Amino acid sequence: MGPFDCAAETLPACRAVLQRLTEDDLSRPTPCTEYTVGDVGQHVVRSMVLLASVAGERIDTPVAGTLEENVAATAEAALAAWRRHGLDGPVAVGRSVMPAGLAAQIIPLELLVHGWDIAQATGQSIDASPEVASYLLARARELITQDKRGRSFAAEVPVRPEATALRRLIAFTGRPP
């Protein structure tokens, strides 16, 4: 499994949540307490633009269209950039250097976790297969290091041992599932 396999599941799942949003939903609070649904969606768009640049390609931030259209367009463009770049070798992500294959995993991780945030805020659910959620949890454990806790991510939330892979992933990212 890799970022493209995961995104083949997480992008449609995220889009399904975004397609059901109303204009009023955009101002709803999310589990990311300082961000609204609209803020989280725009964060995903900006993340996809950044991740495309990490793969060496510039994509524009959309200025028109629905949140669903903008997330989908930038995610698809970022995935295409990574397909062209490939998953071998190191890449610079901000001040860090990491394996390209790991950096590309941020795309499906962002789509699933922030899709979950938006789903929770709007009374929806988001689906992910146990395989994809488990795989992304393993990648999240590589990406979310202790030094990122408290700034970008809250502390891991405890969950029962029998919790689903998606619940474990969400809890690991500091959100109460």
Residue map of PLM features:
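Glycine-rich loop at the start of a catalytic domain that most often binds anionic cofactors/ligands
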Residues: 44
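Extended, alpha-helix-rich binding/interface surfaces that flank or overlap catalytic cores
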Residues: 40
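Structured surface interface patches that mediate subunit assembly and partner/cofactor docking
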Residues: 1-5, 9-16, 20-33, 37, ...
